[in-house]
Swiss-Prot record:
Present with 861 molecules/cell in log phase SD medium. This is Repression factor of MSEs protein 1. Its main location: nucleus. It comes from Saccharomyces cerevisiae (strain ATCC 204508 / S288c). Tethering factor required for histone deacetylase HST1-mediated repression. Probably involved in targeting HST1 to a subset of SUM1-regulated genes.
Amino acid sequence: MSTNTEIIKNSDLQSLINDKRRLINEIKDFNKSIKPLEFESYQDYFLIKTFKKGISASGHVDIDSLRNKEYGIYYKKIKRNSTQEVGEPIPRNTSSSSSSTRSNSSADISDTEYSGENTPTTTGAASRRRRTRSRAIQRENSLPASLPSISEANANNDDVTISEINGSELPFPIPISEVENIDIASDITERDGIRRRSSRISERDKRRSQSRLGSEEDEEGDGHDGDEGETKIQDLYESLVPKILESRRRSDWILPPKARYTPEKQMRTKPSFKSIKINELVGNKRIRSILSRFEGGVAGIRKRDWDSTQ
C-alpha cells in the first residue's frame, strides 16, 4: 500500500510540474504575440521630438521653411477693435486745438453747443460728446414710446421741478434750459459707458459661467436618458502621428544626414584683436618727431626705453 501511495504522489507532483512548464510556455508565446502600439517610423518620432510652434494644418511643422516676409513670427498680436460702441467714452485728443476750441465754445454756449472731443474735463477723465438740440430730438423720436423723457416724468411728478436738478450730479455740466431736450435712454447709455472695465469683465464672466452650467445640466439630462453603463469617450482634436498595430520599429530607421535635426550651436570662440602699446609706438623716433609737432603730442607718455626702439 505504501508503494502505491508513493507512486500516486510522484505522479501528482510530475503532473503539477508539467502544468507549470506548460503555463510558462503559454505565457512566453502570448508575450511574443503582443505587438505594442508604436510610431510608424523614426521620422515621425523625430518630428515629435523636434516639434516647434508654427503655422500648419496637419501638425507636421517645418518652421524654417515658413519663415518668410509674411510669417516672420509664429504668432499675431491681437489688437482691440478701433470702432467704438454707442455710449463708450471718446478718447481725449491732446492736440493744440483743445484750448482754442474750449475758449470759442464757452463764448457761444447759449447759441450753438460744442462737441466735447477736443475739450478735456476738469477732473482729468476723457470727455464725452455733448448732445445738441437736434440730436436729442431725433434720438427721442427714434426711441419707442415706452421710455418717457425727463419732461414727461417731471409733468407726472409735481414735487420735482427742473430748477431743483443739480448740474453737478450730471456726467457733464448742462444749462438748465437744455435738460428737457435730453432723454433717459441717452443718459443710460452714457452711464453704461462710464462703468469700470473690471465690472464689465466680471459681469461677462458671470454670464459665461451661467451659460456653461446650463449647457452642462442639459448634457447630464441627456446622458441619464441613455444607457447608464455606456461611457462617452471624446477623441483628441488632432493626432500628431497616428499609431498602428503592425508598425516598424523606429530604432531600425536612420535618417540621412540632410534630414537629421542639428540644433543651432553658438560658437564658443573669443575674438582676438591686434593691439599696439602706446609706449612702444612712441618709442620710435620718427613717430615721436611727428607727435612733437602737435600741441601736447608726447605729453603724459612715459619716456622709458625711448632710445631702445629705433
